[in-house]
């Protein structure tokens, strides 16, 4: 094999945990046609593994619906000063463990954007967990009663990005608030969280039934976070079948 072929084969073999010694032995007797066949075999195996990994990450994310960002209208999404759209779509906030708060009334596309960013993260090989917040609190409470809370927290902690959808839509009792706080505090400076909410920061104390707990959460989010405001008309209303509008539109949150 020539040097270029050697390097390519070694690289592919390394990704599949095939030893250099095995490739060296193969190189000693293989014909060019055999080398080409092995290249194609390894390419196929690598592609299959990438697809399997992508599918596994997608299942673990538990998105309610799969949505990309092709055609997403950012006209009514107000970014923080100095924060560019390319930075958001480049997912630079994830390796920096920065949080994003998507704030706006219902139907402005907050959940769609959160899922779209989560899909991009999966395409990059990153782990994502999507949770409707009130449902998550119920699941955490059940896990605590069943003695499986640590297992659940470890699973969530494996993610690079956590999406807490409809944050604050339903108030929590103090026990639920403390369980949710474990996830938020445990993610601080370790992984990113996207919150979608229609509740302004000043009212988060009513959601958590504890002003001090709410203040501690806000402090962590603000320290390494950015606020994106969603304005304009409800996308659901503008695309509603009831009014004879766009019949191909997907529901938005």
Q: Where are the predicted features?
A:
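N-terminal pre-Walker A segment at the start of P-loop NTPase domains
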Residues: 67-89
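Walker A/P-loop nucleotide-binding motif
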Residues: 97-113
């Amino acid at each position: 094999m020539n040097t270029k072929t050697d390097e390519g084969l070694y690289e592919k073999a390394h990704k599949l945990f095939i030893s250099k010694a095995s490739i060296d032995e193969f190189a000693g007797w293989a014909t060019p046609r055999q080398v080409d066949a092995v290249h194609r075999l390894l390419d196929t195996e690598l592609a299959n593994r990438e697809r399997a990994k992508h599918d596994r990450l997608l299942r673990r994310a538990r998105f309610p619906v799969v949505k990309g960002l092709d055609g997403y209208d950012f006209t009514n999404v107000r970014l923080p000063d100095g924060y560019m759209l390319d930075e958001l779509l480049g997912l630079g906030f994830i390796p920096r463990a920065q949080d994003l708060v998507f704030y706006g009334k219902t139907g402005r596309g907050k959940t769609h954007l959160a899922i779209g960013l989560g899909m991009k993260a999966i395409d990059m090989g990153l782990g994502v967990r999507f949770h409707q917040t009130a449902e998550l609190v119920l699941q955490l409470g059940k896990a605590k009663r069943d003695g499986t809370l640590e297992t659940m927290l470890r699973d969530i902690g494996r993610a690079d990005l956590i999406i807490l959808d409809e944050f604050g839509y339903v108030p929590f009792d103090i026990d639920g608030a403390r369980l949710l706080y474990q996830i938020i505090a445990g993610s601080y400076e370790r992984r990113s969280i996207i919150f979608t909410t229609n509740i302004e920061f000043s009212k988060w104390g009513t959601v958590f039934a504890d002003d001090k707990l709410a203040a501690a959460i806000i402090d962590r989010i603000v320290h390494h976070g950015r606020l994106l405001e969603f304005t304009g008309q409800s996308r659901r209303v503008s695309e509603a079948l009831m009014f004879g509008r766009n019949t191909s539109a997907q529901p938005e949150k």
